[in-house]
Amino acid sequence: MTKQTEYKRKPEWLKIKLNTNENYTGLKKMMRSKNLHTVCEEAKCPNIHECWAVRKTATFMILGAVCTRACRFCAVKTGLPTELDLQEPERVADSVVQMGLKHVVITAVARDDLKDGGAAVFAETVRAVRRKNPFTSIEVLPSDMGGVEENLKMLMDAKPDILNHNIETVRRLSDRVRARAKYERSLEFLRRAKEMQPDIPTKSSIMVGLGETREDLIEAMDDLRANNVDILTLGQYLQPSKKHLPVLKYYPPAEFAELKEIALSKGFSHCEAGPLVRSSYHADEQVRSAKEKTAEAK
């Protein structure tokens, strides 16, 4: 049996028990009523039922639901985006109140059609959530916003509790996996964020199963640490449709455990690694862990 045939079917550890209790259905109705989007739905996250039904958490996706890029791993719609909705920040903030969230993740589609990459609306969303939810920690997950330093500064000046920007894959595969984004530009984005606000933890995520080697992954970890990234998440890539890149390998849980140990040995303050781990998975626990370790270091 060839390796390709061996990984044709999803293994047992990727089978998910669906839970659509009243929390799940209630959150879904609320999102629709407020004309809000979540990356949980748009990117077909495998953890949506756990997060919505059990943990009652969600990751808001602002700046519309249409992305200007067409990364070959991503299920989010691509094309010409809609006009900016300047009332969106307040609706997100109101939803955080209604959901009673202790930690919220705010992400966005890439808006290469905008000079600021959507930074102004992103920053205002952070401020709106902070005004109405002063005890809620806020994590932001932006695109590289064109690599423009002023755009990043606008966002960092809003003082999120954590800055997350994903390199998504290893250096060797980056151009094939996300042609409109650049590996080095993402590293620079993360480095600049830390330079602008040294006390704000930074975070990044890598998908596995796209053809990377163990050496590729170790190189990516070293690159992130060299740019002072604090938190790393590692998860299994799952093909959203036949139009997207195929899965070349399904990593077993034991291999994720090995990768986590390697990451922690590199100096990451926290590493979340597992088949169903996504960038926002258990994000509240990640930011708490990072802050505790930062306090200990002082």
From Swiss-Prot:
For this record, an example GO cellular component is: cytoplasm
Specify which residues bind [4Fe-4S] cluster 1 according to the UniProt entry for this protein: 40, 45, 51, 280
Q: Which InterPro entries match?
A: Aldolase_TIM (IPR013785), Elp3/MiaA/NifB-like_rSAM (IPR006638), LIAS_N (IPR031691), Lipoyl_synth (IPR003698), rSAM (IPR007197)
Pathways involved: Protein modification; protein lipoylation via endogenous pathway; protein N(6)-(lipoyl)lysine from octanoyl-[acyl-carrier-protein]
Q: Which SMART domains match?
A: Elp3 (SM00729)
- Which UniProt keywords are present, listed alphabetically? 4Fe-4S, Cytoplasm, Iron, Iron-sulfur, Metal-binding, S-adenosyl-L-methionine, Transferase
Q: Which GO terms describe its molecular function?
A: 4 iron, 4 sulfur cluster binding; lipoate synthase activity; metal ion binding
Q: Name one Pfam family in it.
A: LIAS_N
Give the protein family.
Belongs to the radical SAM superfamily. Lipoyl synthase family.
Matching HAMAP family:
Lipoyl_synth
The identity of this protein, by name, is Lipoyl synthase
Instruction: Please give the organism.
Output: Bacillus cereus (strain B4264)
